[in-house]
Amino acid sequence: LHLLSRRQRQMCIRDRISGADLPIQPPEDIRAFFEANPDKEFVHFDPHPFSPFNDERVYYRHFFQNIDLRRHPVLGVINGILLSGQKLLRIKRNQDVHFTKGSQWFSCTDGFARYLLTKEEWVLQVLDKTFCSDEFFVQTLIAQSPYQDKIYQGPGDTSARAIDWDRGNPWVWKYADLEQLKASPCMFARKFDIEKEPELVHEIERLYAPHI
């Protein structure tokens, strides 16, 4: 939210991308695409049913969000005990919230960015100690907002990003996927790993991002 606030004066369409993302269209086509869709919100929604694991993420508190529990196994055990205790005592929060989930990488209009900023108190109250809350807050808020009807519904994913959730979490694109990426109507793609697939990354950069 604060990152969006700092960027408010920079551009009308705000893109949230990571270092594992690359453009898969020429810069002029990306610019033309967003200019042709100036009032659309590009937000991904998980098409799969809400799983018991996701229920656990949003309805119970996870007390060590800022700690990598894989490196601190004792805290991982404590976290599991606290989680089991909440279930045993039926301490289930947020039961009045209809959660939706998707990728945290999105592009949005200035209007929706400002709308998100007005919801900071709600985010802190509802999503504090939620496990990976960045996969819930944008989708949940936009689905219950005046911007719901502005979600992009054109070719490809609603986020304008080619992300393969069927083969991975997400799938790391391979060189064998190059033709699939070239045929995609999306503007960006993720996830790329230059250590594992340097040939693919360099080819994508050569085709679509020679300035990088």
Model feature map: region roles:
Residues 24-59:
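Conserved donor-nucleotide/metal-binding helix-loop-beta segment in metal-dependent transferases, i.e.
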Residues 93-107:
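A recurrent flexible, glycine/aromatic-enriched loop bordering the glycosyltransferase active site
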Residues 99-103, 123-129:
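Active-site rim elements
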Residues 125-212:
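C-terminal catalytic/acceptor-binding lobe
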Residues 1-9, 13:
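Single conserved hydrophobic/aromatic residue that forms the stacking wall/gate
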Residues 14-19:
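Short beta-strand-to-loop acidic/aromatic patch adjacent to the donor-nucleotide binding site
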Residues 57-95:
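Membrane-proximal basic amphipathic "stem/tether" segments
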Residues 104-120, 138, 146:
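Conserved nucleotide-sugar donor-binding
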